[in-house]
Every structure is written in C-alpha cells, then in structure tokens.
C-alpha cells in the first residue's frame, strides 16, 4: 500500500476525507462504496465495535436496472478514524446518493407514475426524481470534501449507454462549477477492451478530466490508490518551483535567459489551476530553443507543489561566457586554459588594485613588495663605539602609480570663416542631441576620437628615456632616504 497517497490526501483535506460518490443512477456508486469500505476502511479500524457497526452500514448494491439507493446515506453515519500502517491517521466518511435518473432505470415509478417520497428537505412529499436531484446536489455541495464520479458504459446494468449521457454531463459540470476536486471512474465489465479504451478517450476529451476504467465489483487496493491519486491531481496547484543550472541562477535577473524563462512561465500559468494541468507549463518551456530538456522532477501532492527541472543546451554556457567576457570559448579545454591565464592575471591585479584606486582618487598609489620579492644580502658585522652588531640589508621592488592628467587639442583647418562657423554649428547640434556621437564625427577621413587619441599617445610616448630613468632614481632616493623636500627644475 502506498501510504504517501493517503498522507497527501490528509494534508489537502486537513485530515477529514468526506468522499461524495455521485453520478447517474445504476452506475455502481454503492458498489464502489462497499469495495472502498471493505478494502481500505474496515481493515484499518482498531475498535471492533465500530468495525462491526461500520460493516452493517455499508449500502446494498446489486446488478440490473432497479434503483437500490432511495436516499442519500452517510457511510458510516459518523466519520470513523482509521490509521493506515500506523503512520497516517484519517477521518473517513463516504456519502452515497441516489443519482440523477436515467431512462431505462426501474424503481422510481409506481403504476406508470412518479413515486412520491418524504425527505428532510421539505414538509411535503415530492417525486422520487426531484428528491434524487436535490439529494445529489447536496452531497456534491455540502457533504463532501472530494468527489468520485461513477460512470458506466451500460455493461454492468444492461441500460443503453446513451441514457447516461445527459445526467453524467450535469454531475460533472456541477462539480466543476463548485471547483471540488474529483476523479472519474468508468465502471465496466471489460476495462481493458478496445471499445472501453475508445470510450475513455472520448470522455476525457469531452470533459477534460482523466477517466479510470475499472470493474468496480473486482476493485482492489491498488485501484483505490489510483482513484485517490487522480483526486490529488485535481487539487489546486499552489506553487511552482523551477530548478535551474547553478550558473543560470548566477545571472542577473534581467538577463535574456532568465527573462525568457520568467515570461514563458507567466504565459503558461494563465490557464492553469490544477496539478494535472502541469503539461501546459512543460509544453511552454519546451518551446524555448536554448533548453535541452524540460521535465517534472517531483510533485508534492500533499502541498500542491510542482518541481520542474530545466536543462540548458551544452553550448549555451560557453555562449554566455563569450557574451560576458568577450573570449571565444568552444570547449572545456579552452575554458581551463583561459581560467588558468585569468587566474594569473587576477593574482597580479590583486597586488596593484588598492594602489590603482588610490591613484585614481588621490593621484598617487603605492604597491608594497610581497615577502617573496624580498632579496636579502649577506649579514655584516658592524661596530658602534665599543659594541658590535649585525647589519641585515634587504632590497625589494615597490611600484608607484602616479596619475598625470594629459590635455590635448585638435585644430583642423576647414577653410574660410563661414565654413568654420558651419562646422562649429554642426558639432554643437550633434553634441546637444547625442554627445557620444560627437566623437564619431568625420574629420578628413578620421573620426574625432581617432584624432584625439593620436594626439594623446604622441604626448605619452614623447617623454625621453633618460628623463624616465632620472624620475625613477629621484623617487627611489626620496623613498629610501626619507627626504621631505624636493626641488624640480624643468628646462
């Protein structure tokens, strides 16, 4: 026995499982209740007195066309608590009803006229058919937390299948209107026949609900579990959890991959309300070209939660890496090589990062040497007065980053005064509308950006080598000798 099914049902109904068994008359509703009680409920009642009383309250059932149930009946009269395999506690009560009258059924007329019956719903007697309808509606609306609709192909009663169509349509529509979770059982003497399979497909397409063909008289525990699982799938869907590859989770929320997934999910859930509608979501995701596989990882029926796995295509990871980094990567071997190189670069950058920030903000930054860069000379004995000591000398490179603002100007000759004014006017218009486009303005076959860049580079590389060496020595002397004053003469 699958305890999880009953545990999940218990969660969704807060432990009280009131099952309304409804449908047209002469479909096998009472038989379904009898088999349900015999297979699941009675064996799990601990109290022997309650067990005997419940057995006595099981409704009569029989074959043929004669209506056996004449009024709604609670089985047992009070909800009975059962414990399944000492793990799941449930309070169970089933509700049997007469059902909607079908043409060809017997027992609702006397002498060619409708039988009059007394009911708790009216002080006056009413026709059997009217009482049956009121009772059926009350079972559906007021006395059940879940529903089991029992239909038939007519083989169990000898009544023509066409006679059942109109009343079964009414029952299913009423359950849908009330949004009660329910399952549909097709009672037949030949559940595995081709004709039954065709009827099942026809009913599923017509009512848009799963239909379970079975011979109710021969129903076993496994069949009951299948019916209860079908009911669970008819409960509302409360939460959808999407499992993505970890690298996708690391992308920013507005990245096109995440945006596509979120948009698809929003579009897919518009018409989804029940757990069994999950195929609509799966279908929506399967249309995303960058996904390799989409599937349901797990369904937590007791909570109404569905976990969906989304697997991306293998090359998507490399495409996104290229998009983010600018490096062309076509496989793991290239990725490993790139990571190795970038790791070395990062280690070097980490050393100068702080100094670089200081240079940008304050104009000057220093990179202190690491322990590995220290170079020790041989120790020397030194004399100071009458005492002796040891002199230890160490050398290490330090980096000094200085910010020097470079200014330049471009003064192209464009012709006479009018032409110069026209050029100024044009450049001002571009600057006001789209400042960034100003740099792309064409000047004698080159963009303004290229002209300025050439001027800046020319200034950077015109500093003579000997001047650079002198500046280095000067800085070295200031650092080592601690001079706080410097006189600079530029010639």
UniProtKB/Swiss-Prot annotation:
Signal peptide: none annotated. Residues 334-362 form a coiled coil. Its EC number is 3.6.1.-. InterPro entries: P-loop_NTPase, SpoIVA_ATPase, SpoIVA_C, SpoIVA_middle, Spore_IV_A. One of its GO terms (cellular component) is endospore-forming forespore. Disulfide bonds: none annotated. One of its GO terms (molecular function) is ATP hydrolysis activity. Disruption phenotype: Sporulation defects. Defects in proper coat localization around the forespore, but not in cortex formation. It is found in: Cytoplasm. It catalyses: ATP + H2O = ADP + phosphate + H(+). Its main location: cytoplasm. It holds the Pfam family SpoIVA_ATPase. Transmembrane segments: none annotated. Keywords: ATP-binding, Coiled coil, Cytoplasm, Hydrolase, Nucleotide-binding, Sporulation. A motif (Walker A motif) lies at residues 23-30. One of its GO terms (biological process) is sporulation resulting in formation of a cellular spore. It is an enzyme of class 3 (hydrolase). ATP binds at residues 23-30. ATPase. Has a role at an early stage in the morphogenesis of the spore coat and is required for proper coat localization to the forespore. Interacts (via Walker A motif) with SipL (via C-terminus LysM domain). This is Stage IV sporulation protein A. It comes from Clostridioides difficile (strain 630). The gene is spoIVA.
């Amino acid at each position: 026995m699958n305890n999880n099914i009953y545990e999940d049902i218990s969660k969704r109904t807060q432990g009280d499982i009131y099952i309304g068994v409804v449908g047209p008359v002469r479909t096998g509703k009472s038989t379904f209740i009898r088999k349900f009680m015999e297979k699941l409920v009675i064996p799990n009642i601990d109290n022997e007195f309650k067990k005997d009383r419940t057995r006595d309250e099981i409704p009569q059932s029989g074959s043929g066309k004669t209506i056996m149930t004449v009024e709604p009946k609670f089985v047992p009269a009070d909800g009975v608590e059962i414990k399944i395999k000492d793990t799941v506690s449930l309070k169970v009560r089933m509700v049997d009803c007469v059902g909607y009258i079908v043409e060809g059924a017997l027992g609702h007329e006397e002498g060619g006229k409708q039988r009059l019956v007394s009911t708790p719903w009216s002080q006056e007697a009413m026709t059997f058919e009217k009482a049956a309808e009121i009772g059926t509606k009350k079972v559906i609306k007021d006395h059940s937390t879940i529903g089991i609709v029992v239909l038939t192909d007519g083989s169990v009663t000898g009544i023509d299948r066409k006679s059942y169509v109109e009343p079964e349509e009414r029952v299913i529509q009423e359950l849908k209107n009330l949004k009660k979770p329910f399952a549909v059982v097709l009672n037949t003497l030949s559940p595995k026949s081709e004709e039954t399979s065709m009827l099942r497909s026809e009913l599923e397409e017509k009512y848009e609900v799963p239909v379970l063909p079975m011979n109710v008289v021969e129903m076993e525990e496994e069949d009951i579990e299948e019916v209860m699982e079908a009911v669970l799938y008819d409960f509302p869907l409360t939460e959808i959890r999407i499992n993505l590859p970890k690298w996708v989770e690391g992308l920013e929320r507005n990245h096109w991959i995440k945006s596509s997934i979120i948009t698809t999910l929003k579009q897919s859930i518009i018409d989804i309300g029940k757990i069994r509608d999950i195929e609509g979501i799966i279908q929506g995701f399967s249309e995303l070209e960058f996904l390799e596989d989409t599937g349901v990882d797990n369904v937590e029926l007791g909570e109404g939660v569905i976990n969906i796995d989304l697997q991306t295509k293998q090359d998507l990871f490399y495409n996104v890496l290229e998009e983010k980094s600018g490096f062309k990567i076509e496989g793991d071997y290239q990725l490993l090589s790139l990571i190795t190189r970038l790791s070395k670069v990062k280690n070097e950058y980490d050393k100068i990062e702080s100094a670089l920030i200081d240079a940008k903000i304050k104009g000057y930054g220093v990179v202190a040497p690491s322990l590995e860069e220290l170079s020790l000379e041989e120790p020397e004995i030194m004399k100071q007065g009458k005492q002796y000591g040891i002199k230890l000398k160490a050398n290490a490179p330090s980096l000094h980053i200085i910010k020097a603002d470079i200014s330049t100007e471009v003064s192209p000759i464009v012709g006479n005064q009018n032409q110069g004014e026209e050029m100024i006017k044009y450049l001002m218009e571009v600057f006001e509308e789209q400042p960034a486009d100003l740099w792309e303005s064409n000047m004698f076959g080159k963009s303004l950006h290229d002209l300025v860049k050439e001027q800046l580079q020319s200034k950077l590389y015109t500093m003579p080598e000997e001047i650079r060496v002198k500046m280095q020595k000067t800085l070295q002397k200031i650092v080592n000798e601690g001079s706080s004053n410097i006189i600079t003469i530029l010639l």
